[in-house]
Amino acid sequence: MNEATIEVSGLRKRFGQTLALDGLSFTVTPGTVTGFVGPNGAGKSTTMRVILGLDSVEAGTALIGGRPYARLTHPMRQVGSLLDADALQPSRSGRNHLRWIARSQRLPVSRVDEVTALVGLGKAVRRKAGGYSLGMRQRLGIAAAMLGDPSTLIMDEPFNGMDPEGIIWMRGFLRGLAAEGRAVLVSSHLLSELPDVADHVVVIGRGRVLADGTLRELTAGESSLEDVYLRLTTGAVEYRSGIDQEQHR
């Protein structure tokens, strides 16, 4: 198996009496951007946390290159992730935030300037991160994810807080990652962005896969991805206390 491949198989997880993941299975292959969509509470963020070894499951496996995250030899060189753009120390500059991560993960500090340029933070990287807009915090989080030059990227709602210029940049950035042969899993509520970014789409609801295919396959005979999504998720929206924010947002 290619070291970039994400393979999720039969994930089952409960939060109390609520079944959050119900036999969830899908694969993210190298050289593709896979869009991961579903209503609030569907299990998207929980699934990403399971893949990254942050949550346990009752059953099933989540593998990266054939191994669970906990058994990766150097996780940040193999997997980069953005789950929460607010996971930073606001009193640190963006640059010092990245340097701290690099040192703690035994990555070259020289990568800091490279990833800063990659995400377009410019001189803002010298300012305290607590003063960043959400879009800038997203860029900082992506820079952190890229420090290890990983072959696999997992990003939860990276378009959030982006202005039009930022959205255009993000499209090109994600497509560029896939063109380099990386496997990219991206969740998003902005369905209008996915046709310009994703090769493959996984739609989930109530912890189950509702559809899994290429954009062409999913939209065959329908006018848009939004139409497909609404058809599939009608009846799969259930706002549940404690689960609606995926437990972790």
Residue ranges of predicted features:
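ABC transporter nucleotide-binding domains
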Residues: 3-6, 13-186, 191-205, 210-211
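Conserved beta-strand-loop-alpha-helix hinge in the C-terminal portion
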Residues: 208-230
